[in-house]
């Protein structure tokens, strides 16, 4: 049976993916004054960075050590593919366009988040004492 933490993380990850899909199905919002294209790209990086962190945290609850140890890489790959499908999806939404530069910033955000998760996880696992019952 999954732990409560795992259920919450997976639920949050799927809910966030749904929010991304719904947001990209809506007409293009008017940008806030002063944000311009730089703010838009930063939001893409932030959006997919957060998605990657949620994915990595959820994947790290999987009990398979091969999957668990690759949580950051798997999360990055899934987030990048989701970003690609999101941009393709927007080509079918009136008043929206699929933008390859948006996808690039989705990938940048996902890569930074995956790297940060990997570094954090490496440091936490080195600092944690190894018990005699834990698998090596």
For each predicted feature, which ranges?
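Short helix-capping/hinge motifs at transmembrane helix termini and TM-loop junctions
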Residues: 26-27, 60, 94, 121
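Membrane-interfacial alpha-helical segments at the cytosolic side of multi-pass membrane proteins
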Residues: 47-62, 108-121
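"…centered on the first transmembrane helix and the immediately adjacent amphipathic helix/loop
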Residues: 1-58
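Interfacial helix-loop-helix junctions of multi-pass membrane proteins
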Residues: 30-38, 83-107
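Short, conserved structural micro-motifs that define repeat-unit consensus positions
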Residues: 40-55, 79-90, 98
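Membrane-interface capping segments at transmembrane-helix boundaries
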Residues: 119-131
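Lipid-exposed faces of alpha-helical membrane segments in multi-pass integral membrane proteins
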Residues: 8-22, 46, 77-81, 85, ...
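Internal alpha-helical transmembrane segments of multi-pass membrane proteins
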Residues: 63-77
